[in-house]
Each structure stands twice: as C-alpha cells, then as structure tokens.
Amino acid sequence: MRGGSWPSVVVRALQAVGGVLLATSVAAQEPTTPPPSIPVLPPVTVIDTAPLPAYGIPLEKYPGNVNSIGPEDLRRQNVDDVAETLYRRLGSVNITSAQSNPWQNDVTYRGFLASPLTGSPIGLSVYLDGMRFNDGFGETVSWDLIPRLAIAGIDVIPGSNPIFGLNTLGGALAIHTKNGREFPGTMLGASGGSFGRWSVEGEHGGSRGPLDWYVAFNALDDDGWRDHSPSELRQIFGTVGLQDRGTRVSLTYIYANNDLVGNALAPTSTLARDRSAVYTFPDQTRNVMHLGHLRGSHQVTDDLLLSANAFFRDYQRQTFNGDAEVNCVDDATGEVAFDASGRRLHLGRCSGSAVGFFDSAGNPLAGTLRRQAEAADRTTRTHTQDWGTTLQVSHKASILGHGNRLTAGVAYDGHLARFNQREADADFVLSGQSVGTLRTGPFETRVDVATEQHNVGVYATDTFDITDRWALTLAGRYQHVDIAIRDRSRHNPALDGDHAFSRLSPSAGLAFRALDALTLFGSYSEGFRAPTAAELTCADRNAPCNLPNAFLADPPLNPVVARTWEVGARGTLPFGKQLQWTVALFRTDLEDDILFTVTESAGGGFFRNVSQTRRQGVEAGVSGEWTRLRYFVSYAYTDATYQTSTTLASVTEADGVRVRPGDRIPGIPEHSLKVGAEVEVLNDLWVGADVIAVSGNVLRGDDANHHAKLDGYALLNLNARYEPIKHVELWTRLDNVTNARYATAGALNFNAFASPIGVERFVSPGSPIAAYAGVRVRF
C-alpha cells in the first residue's frame, strides 16, 4: 500500500473491519427468529509430543506456545493452499512470494523458512501424518503436493524441538489428514473467480464395522494475474483403515500432477508501467508425485501404545526457465572479461578500459568494458525417491504417585535423487512490457549428478508431574546423516564425495499451572540441520551456481546448530463462551547458519556458513466467541539479525557486503498482525472480515541495511457463507478489498533491460483485488 506509515495503514484497515462488523452486528441484534445455538469447537487440550500417535500431554503441561488450526477453521477460510491458511491465521507466519505464484510461497515462522525452492535455507520441518514431508534433495517443501481438502488440522510446534529431527531449527508443522470414521459423508463443490480461476472438488468418507474409507479430489485452473502465469493443479487423496478394539491400521495414497508458472521478481521501473508485467518468462515448474503411506497403532495395555509407519514417495520435478544474464564484456570483441585469476570480472567493476583483463582463452583484451545482457534457456529435471519407517512406543504410568508419560522411538529415512540440467542460447522476445526468451541453439547438458542420503534418528521425550501443578519435560534425539554425491556425466569426477554428520540434541521445559485458568512455561531446546546435497555441491565462491542449475566440487559446509530459549503464559478468561489468550518470548541462536549469497545477475551464487545469527521476538494472541461473534487477534515481533562481523559476496557490490552484529537479515519483517472476525447476521448467514498487516523488510542483497526497506502493507479481506437450504452452502471471498499495491519480497540486482544497465530494486508484486465464489453440496 503506497503512502503512509505502517501503523497508519493498519489503523485504516482496522477501521474498515470495524465498520463492516458494526453494521453486521446491528443487523444481528434483531433476528426474525430466536438465535439458534452455535456449535462450539472444544479447545485443543492434548498436545502430541511426537510425530506418531502417542500419549500426549494436556495443554497446561506443555512448555511451549503451540498453535493449532482445526477443520472448522480450514473450512471457513475457503483458501486453496496450506501456506495461505497459516499466513492468514497466525501472526508468526508470513509469506514471501518470490515466485509470484500462490502455490509456491516461501513460508516463514519466527524468521525460519519452509520453501519449495531448492537452495532456500530451510529451518522448519514438515510432517504429514507422522511422515517427514521435506524432500530428500534440498529439504524443500512443495505445498502444492498437499491436498488441502483432505487436511483435518495443523499443529505449529515452536522451537528447536529435537523430537522432530532434521531442520527443526525454529519449529515444526504437523499436518493431519481426514479419515472416514471421523469425517463421514459426501461433499461436491465448485468455485470460480478472478483471473480465470475455476475449481471442482469432492470428498467422501464412511465406515462399516471395522472398515473406514475416505477419498478426496481437487482440480483447479488459474490464468494468474501477471502476464504468462497460468497454473493447473490436480490432486487425489485416498485412505482406507481398519480399526478393531485397540488396533488401527491405515493405508494412504496421494497423487499430485501440477503445472505451476510463477514469474518471480521484476524491476520497479517495469512494474510502474505495467504491474502485471514479468521480467523474463517462462518460469515453469511441473511437479508429479505418487506417495504411499502405511501406518498403524496398537494398544498393548491401557498404559502402553505401540505405533509404526512406513512410506515411499516418487517425486519428479521439471523446470523450464528463460533467464536474462548480465556479463561484463569488451566492446571491441564482445568477449566476456576475466581477471588474472580466471574469474569473471564483477559487474561492479565493469567500466573503463579492458586493458589488463582477458577473455575465456586467456587472450588480453584491449577495448572498453561494458555490461551486456544475454538470454539463456535452462531446464532441470529432478527425480527423487524417498522412503522411511518409524517405530515408536508410548507409556504412561505413576512413579511414586506422580504421573509420567514416556515416548521413545527410532526413525530411518532414505533418499535417492538424480539431477540433470541443460542450457541453450536464446534471444529475447518482447511481449508488451514483459520479456520472454526464444531458444536459438541446442540444449547442452551441464550437470548430471546422483545423490544418496540416509538419516537415522533415535529419540525420547518424558513428561513428569512434579506436583499436580508443576510438570517437567525432558527430551533428546541422536541424529546421524550420511550423504553420497556422484557425478554421472563422467566429465566432472571431482563432484564425487561422501559426507557424514551426527549430533545429540537435548531439550528441557517446565510448565506451572499457577491458577486453573493460567499456565506459565519455559523451555530450552536444541536443533540440528545437516547441509543438503544441493548446498554441499555449491559452496565455492569461485564457481557460482545457478540454483539448482549447476553443481561443482566445493569446500565442505558445517552443520547448523540451533539453541532456543522460550518463556510464556497462556490462559482463559470468562468472556463470552471463553476467551483464550497466549503470550511468549523466544530467542533462537544459530551456529554456522547456512546462507546463499547471490553473486551473478541471473541468480548465480554459492552457499557459505555464517558463524552466528539470531531470531528473537514476542508472540501474543487472543481468540474466542461472544454470542454470534467469532474473533481472533494474533501479533508477532521478530528480530532477525546477524551476530557476527563478516563480508558476504554480492551481485551489486564488487567488494562484497560487510555485515556487523545487529544488521537485520533480509526478507524477515519485524511486525506482523492478523485480526479476524465472523458474525452470524441471520440464521445460517455468516459475514466475516480479516486484516493482514505486515511491516517492511530488508531487501535481499542488502544485508548491511544500507538501502530503504521494502514497504510494509495492510490487506483487508471479506468473506461470507450462507446455507439457503439444508446441505447446501454458498460462499464468497473478496481479497485485498482496497486494491492495495504492495510487495512481499524484494532484492537488489542489475536490470538487464535498462539503458544503461544498472542496479535496481526488484520486487514481487502482490495480487490486486480479487473475488471468488463457490457452492458446496453435502449429502
């Protein structure tokens, strides 16, 4: 939103929400019939402490600020993506849409990232029904592969919880899917709206005796609001289960076939002329996944529960990118300039005489240096196979009259990946204000590499009731990782390498139920992340990689270690049907954080360790119901900073960027506020509004914080649901009602199409006002 400070845009948006809710509340004060009783979902009272089914602990004994989103919250939002669901509801969750595609969002929680883009510094682990969902090649998370309709709930588990294994630096997401015993019935739905979007969906669940079943499907097409940005999603989910006395076994299959086009950041000068324009196109990703998951649990005795699972996933990812690359060339010969050490001359030094520099063959140059844009088409294919199993035992007992819950397990997962990248010369093609590429030469294979990874973890967590008001939780996990990398092209054997990492990570926490409606808690935890195969093969500053387009023989990287402290409180107040509140303070220090530093205009760069970084902040939330009104407020402050002095390589600064302790890490906003409410205006007619307000963040590439931040923004969204007759629901959603002009991600780079070529701000523009509507029929 242009104009005004971040607080002022928040105030204006909140005033708009207040007007909507005031009007609807007045209408609700004079119903034509007595108001019906409104079903109330019970608050989450038991927290799962491990990936598989276990004896959880009551919420008042959990030493952390866990957040949960239930099935009714998911149904009321009417959004198409897991990431969007989290973003709209939780203050600590934000989106940076670097790809400008709604199904390829980067999700940050407490300043830690889960992303579908290879090379992103992943700091969150994601579990689907107890199965680790981060892929084995780059630990990425492809949100489009998770069928939203089949989701029963999401738990957001804070901190460096060692029980959830690799990448749990800032938290873990535990996603639970539906089954026919708990979600019986049939639903068919259709919807459509802005930018050519349409979708059809359906689900059916049921049970008979010990057998239950559930199936869901979704088909969606979207033209995209930016030029040349269509997407297609096809998702199928099915599960069948057997339940008899204390035993349950289920088999799940998920299929996804999605074609996503998101054309990333664009220069602000281009967007000023046409906000829907793209910098270069196409930028296409094709994801195809088959996943099978077998899981079971057996109640051996009233106090002993055994759980196990096994899974196999076949995942193929293909990309096609038209890129603009800026090189420093000799204007007399057109040859790219290299320095005496054989490195390409940095664009920041590309001026003046070419004397003293050389072409790629080592011949001296004699002309004048200038920047020149070149087009290239790049394709990649990544074929990943992931498999694994977990065995877990959970036991509850009384020790000298004190309650005790112990859960322990052993987990293994393996990964095979084959990566191939090809590149071809191309020409630029103008399409309005957008620029595409057209291939002019043959594709040549640049990389053909295979990786193999094996992860073994042993974990345990124990909660002991010191008294009826004090609970102590101790946990730990030993993790071992083996990674093997092999060159399959027979042209680059230096790629071959074997790497091993291991660590024992502990945690401890205390919860004190000071009053029946007040709990205080505090915890310390450690997490661990091993470098991925993509990172290990792209860590040489002298040989930048176009992620994931190139791999080379590189220096080793150290694993990342996270240490988190958290204190907080939560409780309830007797307001309305019950007001729930929570507040927490956290600090996570990372040792040997792994960052990707961009050194080339087309995105090339390399990974490196940074000795100390920190994410710290405050979370606060309120939610509840009052007569016909449901509401929530969720706020987060996140201070993400470097804690060491170092120089980072840069695409725009020839001497690099010098960062100092206290400099803010790019891409992480300090303030985030989510406010929402829904009121029943008439019987079975619900009208709602929500505000998303996010402060500005530092541009990528400006790690020293010398440039102006990306502007903050505030979005107002409206929604309504109505059941005209039993079993039929009509819904509508209006996003970005004020048509705010905003961006969620930004970077500094050279604009290849400027005259002369120079450094400019690139941003990912947010979607303009959009309307969607649909119908669901249940029977």
What are these regions (language model features)?
Residues 45, 61-116, 127-143, 153-161, ...:
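Periplasmic N-terminal accessory/gating domains of Gram-negative outer-membrane beta-barrel systems
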Residues 123, 133-135, 144-189, 778:
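A beta-strand signature from Gram-negative outer-membrane beta-barrel systems
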Residues 192-221, 226-263, 282-305, 459, ...:
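Transmembrane beta-barrel wall of Gram-negative outer-membrane proteins
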Residues 248-250, 287-488, 582-585, 625, ...:
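Face-selective signature of the C-terminal outer-membrane beta-barrel domain
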Residues 299, 305-323, 513, 519-525, ...:
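Membrane-embedded beta-barrel scaffold of Gram-negative outer-membrane proteins
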Residues 390-395, 400, 467-472, 578-591, ...:
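Gram-negative outer-membrane beta-barrel transporters
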Residues 402-415, 447-588, 678-682:
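Structural signature of Gram-negative outer-membrane beta-barrels, strongest in the C-terminal barrel
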Residues 528, 693-702, 721-779:
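C-terminal beta-signal and adjacent terminal beta-strands/loops
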